[in-house]
Amino acid sequence: MRIVDAGYKSEDKITEGSAEKMVRALIKSNHMAMLEHYSFSVKFICDRGVSHEIVRHRVASYAQESTRYCNYNKSGDVAFIRPVFFEEDTPEMDNWVDSCMRAEKTYNYLISEGRTPQEARSVLPNSLKTEVVMTANLREWRHFLSLRACGSTGKPHPQMLEVAVSLLKELR
């Protein structure tokens, strides 16, 4: 039997500050496998529509606020995220606000009539505020940001773009 070292080792070459140089070299050479060993988590506060864009990234782990079990009636109000594409003081914005107010009123009515949060949530719009924690490795975060902040496969959803660009700025 013969045993050999299968990979190149360079622990003896590691110095203070060499990690950043090494990561940049790995990225430049498109050797992304090494980036899969580092991960971090981000908490997004966004609307349910944007959360559907986020959870499409399958190489990640998620924890999202549940509309099935959260009883918004107990907290006193339902929170909505204002769309970035509606201008203030326009008929569109006024209609959006009215629609959210009607949804909240209907939700609270259904709860007061004994419906469960799971049943009452059916009247809540995509603009409903939610919280999502996403954990991914560095390679997946690069992919996420290339799609959601940089539009590498087409124009991103306007509110997803706002969330992703904000994250990208924070990471730089």
For the regions a protein language model found, what residue spans apply to each?
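Family-specific signature for flavin-dependent thymidylate synthase
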Residues: 1-172
